[in-house]
Amino acid sequence: MEPGSDDFLPPPECPVFEPSWAEFRDPLGYIAKIRPIAEKSGICKIRPPADWQPPFAVEVDNFRFTPRIQRLNELEAQTRVKLNYLDQIAKFWEIQGSSLKIPNVERRILDLYSLSKIVVEEGGYEAICKDRRWARVAQRLNYPPGKNIGSLLRSHYERIVYPYEMYQSGANLVQCNTRPFDNEEKDKEYKPHSIPLRQSVQPSKFNSYGRRAKRLQPDPEPTEEDIEKNPELKKLQIYGAGPKMMGLGLMAKDKTLRKKDKEGPECPPTVVVKEELGGDVKVESTSPKTFLESKEELSHSPEPCTKMTMRLRRNHSNAQFIESYVCRMCSRGDEDDKLLLCDGCDDNYHIFCLLPPLPEIPKGVWRCPKCVMAECKRPPEAFGFEQATREYTLQSFGEMADSFKADYFNMPVHMVPTELVEKEFWRLVNSIEEDVTVEYGADIHSKEFGSGFPVSDSKRHLTPEEEEYATSGWNLNVMPVLEQSVLCHINADISGMKVPWLYVGMVFSAFCWHIEDHWSYSINYLHWGEPKTWYGVPSLAAEHLEEVMKKLTPELFDSQPDLLHQLVTLMNPNTLMSHGVPVVRTNQCAGEFVITFPRAYHSGFNQGYNFAEAVNFCTADWLPAGRQCIEHYRRLRRYCVFSHEELICKMAACPEKLDLNLAAAVHKEMFIMVQEERRLRKALLEKGITEAEREAFELLPDDERQCIKCKTTCFLSALACYDCPDGLVCLSHINDLCKCSSSRQYLRYRYTLDELPAMLHKLKVRAESFDTWANKVRVALEVEDGRKRSLEELRALESEARERRFPNSELLQQLKNCLSEAEACVSRALGLVSGQEAGPHRVAGLQMTLTELRAFLDQMNNLPCAMHQIGDVKGVLEQVEAYQAEAREALASLPSSPGLLQSLLERGRQLGVEVPEAQQLQRQVEQARWLDEVKRTLAPSARRGTLAVMRGLLVAGASVAPSPAVDKAQAELQELLTIAERWEEKAHLCLEARQKHPPATLEAIIREAENIPVHLPNIQALKEALAKARAWIADVDEIQNGDHYPCLDDLEGLVAVGRDLPVGLEELRQLELQVLTAHSWREKASKTFLKKNSCYTLLEVLCPCADAGSDSTKRSRWMEKELGLYKSDTELLGLSAQDLRDPGSVIVAFKEGEQKEKEGILQLRRTNSAKPSPLASSSTASSTTSICVCGQVLAGAGALQCDLCQDWFHGRCVSVPRLLSSPRPNPTSSPLLAWWEWDTKFLCPLCMRSRRPRLETILALLVALQRLPVRLPEGEALQCLTERAISWQGRARQALASEDVTALLGRLAELRQRLQAEPRPEEPPNYPAAPASDPLREGSGKDMPKVQGLLENGDSVTSPEKVAPEEGSGKRDLELLSSLLPQLTGPVLELPEATRAPLEELMMEGDLLEVTLDENHSIWQLLQAGQPPDLERIRTLLELEKAERHGSRARGRALERRRRRKVDRGGEGDDPAREELEPKRVRSSGPEAEEVQEEEELEEETGGEGPPAPIPTTGSPSTQENQNGLEPAEGTTSGPSAPFSTLTPRLHLPCPQQPPQQQL
């Protein structure tokens, strides 16, 4: 069976060791410890502790190397034998003029080597044919039976192998035509192996890696192209019988061949024997035939296609040539036309003298049988690795390696299993079909390129961490030169042995079976990268492995006996194991060590891109193996790396520097070496060589002191000759020096035979010094002579072991333990004596007991050393025993005096030793102290003790010595504690109970608990709570009986305090109800005034705006309203908390705030009026540019100016008035072109801070406030606001009732009536100048015209507060208004400056009020009519109205689609019908929608109560009787005079008396 044909079976794993940190600190010691186990496997793996991670010290950027080229199937021994065999056959057929083609049988290449070998084993070709055993041959080649494969193999053997085997056996065969054999499978051409040729040509580039065999591609044949082109070569063409031979050089250059080989495409695995002559007939050989048959076949041989002429004869004038011009067979020179000249040796043969004879002169190059045989039997050249031509960095090599592996396995490199790589590797090395080539950066000198470990040198500064690893024994630069290592005594830096080598690997790169130089140890560390797979064989099986490899591949070892020392040969571990060789394996991962032991064969390969470092080291146990290795090298005639004798002598010269174990091993080796040297020099004397001279061999180069016979490096002695000065031999080969006489030969020696024993003696003294010392120690420890040594003598022995570096033996450990124990005893004895001197101040817990003292004395007596402290310890023991007797006597005579017991106890403490009786004395003393403490605690005159003290006494009483007095005291304590805990629990329940008890109940509990003589915390807390409750009741009585109603803050504080008290208070419920009612009123007032998500508090809205003049303050407040930074009541009114309780102070502060607000708004109006209009300004911000509340600069159309502060805002950012609807409750129709009545008035959100409810709504809040027995700041502010509004209303009515204003209002009324009479609103009339005396016939309500007044067909539209306008009508209304804008003219009134100024001032003051008044709208209409219509504002309002209506329609359609989807899905969620019924105005977005929604919410919340009857105003039925609508009917009361007069007493001020025209 072909080795490796089956799947690879991994060998067992080698031992793996994981040392602890303590073991890891001594590398060679740990290796010696594990050697008995690991040596049995040959290799082992060591995993360092997890924290040991040396940094990678190689300079990556400067690291450049040239790798070796490895062809995998040339590494394996058996595969190389096959390849060499195929090369020989190929060479044979190539000489014959044909190229080898290997046939395919059963879809695999026929193994010609195995076929030839099996044929020989079965008895040869003739025997197999005779016995018809070709089927057995097929079976042994693992071919399936029953397919007539035997016959197929026979034909292949006959035509390919048999002619070569016959030539090898010496038969004379010439080229003959054989019958062609038509095979069903295509043969495959074989490319000759030619290892020497490959080593001399340029290597292929790495981008041409191929998985299939390049050797199986067509080999470029010797071409005739060069011959045809070169006329000189054309003249040298030789014609004659026989095939051409390669020796003439008529072929393409190697460079051309290599180029074709690289550039040629991959071909399927085929092998052929190709006819080189260019003919159609294949030149094949069959079994030998008779001469006549061969002659007959040759006569029918076709002529070759190559045109050739007869060979030119040589110059006949050459006599020597004429003499040699005879046939070598018959020695005749006649019939020269039948004479053939060999192209190889120039011998002549008659064509009829050859066997078989040739019918005619063959054309082309012809070789005689002798030359063919010589060429085929030429020995192969030694195999070795060739170097690549490309230089790599680590990065470029890694990229190449990873790319190769990923492409080969078709997966990422980290995902390829190690088992798969291992099987594929051994498959490739066993394959002759596939030729995979890899590169391996092996044996890179760390001295030149730098080590992977940190190195302590002057090249660069090391960090503390690097310094630690640079000195570590596991650093491969340090390990070979450790003190216990042999190699530290070699001065030279031996690369690979003392100086580490570096290895940069890629997948499949391998190191072959080998052992280390001089059979030394080796250690390999994998710095990083993918694993490295190792195989190892123990040293006991080393010779067996060599025998197996020689047996399986004798062809290799015949030509290279030291093949295994060349690191170029692999053999499948399964093959070795099948022949009984024990093999182990391991995968070395990054950060792990692999150690190989002496003469342990090992090999392996890399799983991928990695970086490793290796070095050799030798320990004392290696010395015998090193000596045996020299003898082995002598037999193989292999060069030594260093002289073993020199190493031994150098160590023997300085024995004191040697480790003791090493000295013993060196002594043993030195003794053997001296005995051998005596024997060899004696043999010289017997031969008669007496001349000698001293030679310092260590000063000579190694190549000048090598034995010319065995290549051993000489040191102790060598034999030289005066007449042959160029060579010398070791004393083992004295007969191989030269043929000169012995008298001319002389001995060259390093030491005399007298000097060697002296060196040996020094080694013996060093080795035996340990035995002498050990004997002294043994006598001292065992006191064999009856004399105890002093402590100083034992210390001297230990110091001697340390100074002479004795090994850490068991005896040394016993000595150290003895010294340690003795020193501890001395220290303890000194402490005992010093403790007595310290007396009671000695440290507690360090005293020894009496038993320990006696044991300590016995321990000191048993130690093998004398100590004078023993006497002191004996004295202490006597004192303690005397004290013990006295204490026993005192305890026996109880009851004794407590003072006597205490003094006796103090004396015992001074001894420094614990006596058992001392504990009894201590307990008696503690009992007396406890009884005294109980008496003091229970005494009537004593301070009441706490529960914790009583519990502590009970606990302490349980530990004192029992007695009747103790039992009685414990019973009294327990009874008192039980009663106290019961009352304490009752008080706790009163404090924690949800149902609070009245003060009377708590007083009763406290009175009863006062009789208990114990401090009770809960009772005390109950007392304090009761006192606080009484104080709280007093505060309530005081605040309720004051001059004014209590403030809400005071009530809230009392309620908070009362709720925290654990006492039931009747007044608390009443206060809580008052506070709740006040909060309810405040909430209702907030909903009435405050907008949704308002940034103002209710009090801020009701009070005058203190910062009305600061635009930036108002804006920042508006933009940062989410921060909730509201001012307190005192900040708003500028009053202290005490002043807020005085109503008079509140009113005065409110009045002052009104004045500040008015002054501030005037200043703000002047500032804002000075700003440029955004309708004409640019978008660039400046110090005078208006900025909207959104923070953006105002520019272009769409901006509105506030009628109060005169500042500008984006229409989309604020609430704007609506032209097509009126929010008034009683609207009246107005003509379409009465533009002055359109609702175009705009107040910004900074000026209009609240909802501005009507006065009747405020009066309802005041009526509810009147019923509250609580004062609120908001209530008083609301009263002040109401007074301010009524005051302004009176002044406004007075102004409207003047003659000038009444006339102007009359003209407006007349003009409105005239416009109502117009038939077509599309054709507005030209307005005449309004007469100055037209009276005002209608009321001055603010109500703007309804939408139906604007429609051409008079359709009515419901108010938008309830139902959204219809889509069509609203659109037509907007279009109508837009078309009427060009027709608006004005002003329609002429207002004199004397009339306009007061009205404008009244208008400004009215806009400052957070109350809605009809007079305000009347004044605004009058001022509007006195100026031209603001067409720009009207257009802006129309555009905003259109945009809002468009958004409402879109939201309505989206809502309908969402409702339908929910209906289709049947899903749950919000009721779509409810959403549909909601006003679209409410669901719209923007500030206007929010205000409408807030108004509707307020109406729903206040709908139950409702405001009182509206106050009659101008235009209402109650005032229509009066022309000016200002004076009430005689004897009637109008306005809020009566309600206000009832509210005023809450402020404790008289109701203001107003003139009749100012009252409502």
From Swiss-Prot:
Residues 79-169 form the ARID domain. A zinc finger (PHD-type) spans 326-372, 1187-1248. 2-oxoglutarate binds at residues 440, 522, 524, 532. One of its GO terms (biological process) is rhythmic process. Residues 14-55 form the JmjN domain. Residues 1488-1503 have a biased composition (Acidic residues). The modification Phosphoserine is found at residues 287, 301, 317, 893, 897, 1359. The keyword Heme does not apply. Residues 1448-1463 have a biased composition (Basic residues). Residues 1169-1181 have a biased composition (Low complexity). It catalyses: N(6),N(6),N(6)-trimethyl-L-lysyl(4)-[histone H3] + 3 2-oxoglutarate + 3 O2 = L-lysyl(4)-[histone H3] + 3 formaldehyde + 3 succinate + 3 CO2. Residues 1335-1345, 1464-1481 have a biased composition (Basic and acidic residues). Residues 197-227, 1161-1181, 1316-1371, 1444-1560 are annotated as: Disordered. Keywords: Biological rhythms, Chromatin regulator, Dioxygenase, Disease variant, Intellectual disability, Iron, Isopeptide bond, Metal-binding, Nucleus, Oxidoreductase, Phosphoprotein, Repeat, Repressor, Transcription, Transcription regulation, Ubl conjugation, Zinc, Zinc-finger. Changing residue 402 to Y: In MRXSCJ; decreases enzymatic activity. Fe cation binds at residues 514, 516, 602. Pfam families: ARID (PF01388), JmjC (PF02373), JmjN (PF02375), KDM5_C-hel (PF21323), PHD (PF00628), PLU-1 (PF08429), zf-C5HC2 (PF02928). The keyword Transcription regulation applies. It comes from the Eukaryota. Escapes X-inactivation. Part of two distinct complexes, one containing E2F6, and the other containing REST. Interacts with ZMYND8. It is linked to Intellectual developmental disorder, X-linked, syndromic, Claes-Jensen type: A disorder characterized by significantly below average general intellectual functioning associated with impairments in adaptive behavior and manifested during the developmental period. MRXSCJ patients manifest intellectual disability associated with variable features such as slowly progressive spastic paraplegia, seizures, facial dysmorphism. PANTHER family: LYSINE-SPECIFIC DEMETHYLASE (PTHR10694), LYSINE-SPECIFIC DEMETHYLASE 5C (PTHR10694:SF43). Histone demethylase that specifically demethylates 'Lys-4' of histone H3, thereby playing a central role in histone code. Does not demethylate histone H3 'Lys-9', H3 'Lys-27', H3 'Lys-36', H3 'Lys-79' or H4 'Lys-20'. Demethylates trimethylated and dimethylated but not monomethylated H3 'Lys-4'. Participates in transcriptional repression of neuronal genes by recruiting histone deacetylases and REST at neuron-restrictive silencer elements. Represses the CLOCK-BMAL1 heterodimer-mediated transcriptional activation of the core clock component PER2. This is Lysine-specific demethylase 5C.
